[in-house]
Amino acid sequence: WTTDRDGHTVKKYTPDGELLLTLGTFGEWGCDASHFNGPTAVVVQLDGNIVVADGYWNSRLVWFTPEGEYIKSVGEWGRGQAQFNTPHALTQDSKGRLLVADLCGGNFHDYMTVPGQIETHRTKPDKDCVHRIQRLDASGAYIDEWTHIMPLSLASYGNEIYASDKMSNLAILDEETGQVKSRVENIAIYI
């Protein structure tokens, strides 16, 4: 799976590089069943459904069937439960719950956009925003959130969540509590 932020697509390939599925419309941004606006991550759920973090401009998660048929979207820009600023990374834990790395504002730049693509207020840091990992059930319903880390990327292995932050650190979290089990400093940002 690949996400193409600026091409507004998510693609599934075989290990040999054969394209199997394209979600979104290349080069066309939007916020509907067939368009993304800066997708950032993708997860295949335990039931085979596909969840895309449409993160940079639309601030939503989008569900598709294994064949690529649109199911629904969850979220909008905001700081509430199952609302997002920038859903930048996405993973699922061993129980199928979704974890969303939600970055605060200031991640957008005027040169990255075309007129009408993004609201002007979204290009500035939000001083009241809290970086967080939101935990949702498999359908996208809010469970809780962890705010003690500034997440940039996420991965799940066993009963642990690996979260890299914007300070080039890696935190290994307990998937049930979100508590930091260990930390590795000055490591690559993306995992």
Explain the meaning of each model-derived region.
Residues 1-191:
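Eukaryotic scaffold repeat domains enriched in small/polar residues
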